[in-house]
Amino acid sequence: MPEVPETIVVTEEPIELPVAELLTGRGFITGKSGSGKSNTASVIAEELLEVGLPMLIVDTDGEYFGLQERYEILHTAVDDGADMLVDADDAERLAGLALDGNVPIILDLSGYVDPTEGTELITRVIREIFRMEDARRKPFLIIVEEIHEYLPEQGAHGEVGELLIQVAKRGRKRGLGLCGISQRPAAVDKNFITQCDWLVWHRLTWKNDTTVVRQLLGADSAASIQE
């Protein structure tokens, strides 16, 4: 196991986040399109990769491919160009690589024509990681882009959503952390957001989204993210 720092710096200000909370806690990053939310998530990933820590990134739009330019990270996808072509039957192998092989993995879903196939892959991989962590208890972070697609505020969660809720509620005891990312906090299940140990808010403009911030953090915070 590599030597792990107590904190990492994720912004220029700087803002520090405790590594232990990142790896085994629950976090949420939000902001309108172009506000920097995915960049913040990338910086978090880069800082953890810098010290040799593995993670799983659920990449819905192929945004994290650039991490390969600087780090040893396994890019998995359904189409050519990936390091490893995968489907749901590879779930146990991927979980083993991540936890036992200490391999950081990008689960790139951007090539799926049928989104249900991508959802099945996510579900099975995370389920395998959750199962294996019952014995291993190894600090490990799962980063999920567009988490509102799996944990919507309205409508059924589906199998993957229920699994993510389980990770959020019970993952810490197994060493599992979860970081959700969305440009629409109003569209994300508030039961998840309110359970988060850390929150990163970038600029938001839509009233429903700023209302969520006001409810959680107060009027001053809601005003500041509109500026």
Locate predicted features.
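Switch/coupling segment of Walker-type NTPase motor domains
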Residues: I15-V19, I44-R124
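Glycine-rich phosphate-binding loop of nucleotide-binding enzymes
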Residues: M1-H75, F130, G161, W201
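Conserved P-loop NTPase motor cores
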Residues: G27-F28, S33-S35, N39, E117-D220
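Hydrophobic pocket-lining residues within nucleotide cofactor-binding pockets
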Residues: L22, Y112, L204
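Conserved AAA+ ATPase small/helical "lid" subdomain
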Residues: Q226-E227
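Envelope-exposed proteins and targeting segments
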Residues: G25, V103-I105, K138
